[in-house]
Amino acid sequence: AVMGRNLALNIESRGYTVSVFNRSREKTEEVVAENPGKKLVPYYTVQEFVESLETPRRILLMVQAGAGTDAAINSLKPYLDKGDIIIDGGNTFFHDTIRRNRELSAEGFNFIGTGVSGGEEGALKGPSIMPGGQKEAYELVAPILTKIAAVAEDGEPCVTYIGADGAGHYVKMVHNGIEYGDMQLIAEAYSLLKGGLNLSNEELAQTFTEWNKGELSSYLIDITKDIFTKKDEEGKYLVDVILDEAANKGTGKWTSQSSLDLGEPLSLITESVFARYISSLKEQRVAASKVLSGPQSQPAGDKAEFIEKVRRALYLGKIVSYAQGFSQLRAASEEYNWDLNYGEIAKIFRAGCIIRAQFLQKITDAYAETPAIANLLLAPYFKQIADDYQQALRDVVAYAVQNGIPVPTFGAAVAYYDSYRAAVLPANLIQAQRDYFGAHTYKRT
């Protein structure tokens, strides 16, 4: 409800009159009452709402993904005319979007599955927008979407046509998977600095403030520095009294499931999903901590040196995560015939969305230089960072393992990097085993 309300206010602020409808009459009245003088026109039946719009009608749905979206579409259909456009701005599973696009197209309606990132504030002030569907239908809503989107530092709006049917929602799904990876990498960096150097919350905030001035400059680093010093009403640091169970809404899981369907090694992001799952086993972890032993932890040595190693490890880990995510976008583009523009996708992530970061411009530059590049790690800039920072990543992972600090995503970054650069892997033995017990055959070198 908040996302829908804020998007309506955003659209209204760009000079449009917006018809609003909610199943709950009270919520519809509330939105209008809380925003006096705004060009928000309330309607209390679906028929009146639809009939209030100019044709071709442009209807933005912001409802809970799943059955709710189908119910909303079915309630609209009796009053729609051929050529009308429904935009689904929810966190919808892309296969559902492909199905709805096909079904509505057959009836003469247009359907645009649109990823919207930036949370409640982004919806109001300017989100990153990822529309997918019929190109001609997108052209009819592009003026509105362009006006409400976030604007990057170079003045470019953070919206672009992504591709046919489910492409927009797929890109939003991968965006969310990358977000999981970013957040887990940052959490592991925090754990290392706290466990290895015993940094105070003030020192952590100062460290992240410095990091936010350089390569790691991003929304997530920015909010993390603020989180470290936030206190509750009792004067305690809030982060220290929050239960260590991370919830999830399932979009990270969808990204990992899709990687398995496509045969893409999305190991870092998948580990970040599993890290949330194991965090939720709080009772088991507390019990296990009293039974299972670990190593005696040793201090991490020189403070400034270790902080810099963790910073480098975090940046290279982030690069590996994005390399995996964009590799999966390439595989999906081929599988679903979307013809994705990876440089443009990186561009619209530069503002408005949760993963917005300075380094996204480097991804755009890499694809501009070599559009068909197989993996971002092979681009000159990222290859140079890998050359310069891999030792720090290895040192940090080795320290963590020797001192019993779990670093699933840092570990996944090293494993993926070494596997990807290996001309020969021990998979020949696996294939021999498969042939031995199942006559699966093999290829000779």
UniProtKB/Swiss-Prot annotation:
PROSITE patterns for this protein: 6PGD
Keyword Ligase: no
Binding site for substrate: N91, S117, G118, G119, H175, N176, Y180, K249, R276, R434, H440
Matches recorded under Gene3D superfamilies: 6-Phosphogluconate Dehydrogenase, domain 3, N-(1-d-carboxylethyl)-l-norvaline Dehydrogenase, domain 2, NAD(P)-binding Rossmann-like Domain
Annotated GO biological process: D-gluconate metabolic process; organic acid catabolic process; pentose-phosphate shunt
Transmembrane regions listed in the UniProt entry: none
Pathway note: Carbohydrate degradation; pentose phosphate pathway; D-ribulose 5-phosphate from D-glucose 6-phosphate (oxidative stage): step 3/3
Binding site for NADP(+): A1, V2, M3, G4, N22, R23, S24, V63, Q64, A65, N91
Active-site feature positions: K172 (proton acceptor), E179 (proton donor)
Keyword match Transcription regulation: no
Reactions accelerated catalytically: 6-phospho-D-gluconate + NADP(+) = D-ribulose 5-phosphate + CO2 + NADPH
EC number of this enzyme: 1.1.1.44
InterPro entries recorded: 6-PGluconate_DH-like_C_sf, 6PGD_dom2, 6PGDH_C, 6PGDH_Gnd/GntZ, 6PGDH_NADP-bd, 6PGdom_BS, NAD(P)-bd_dom_sf, Pgluconate_DH
Keywords tagged on the record: Gluconate utilization, NADP, Oxidoreductase, Pentose shunt
Family: Belongs to the 6-phosphogluconate dehydrogenase family.
Oligomeric form and interacting partners: Homodimer.
Listed name of the protein: 6-phosphogluconate dehydrogenase, decarboxylating
Species of provenance: Pseudescherichia vulneris
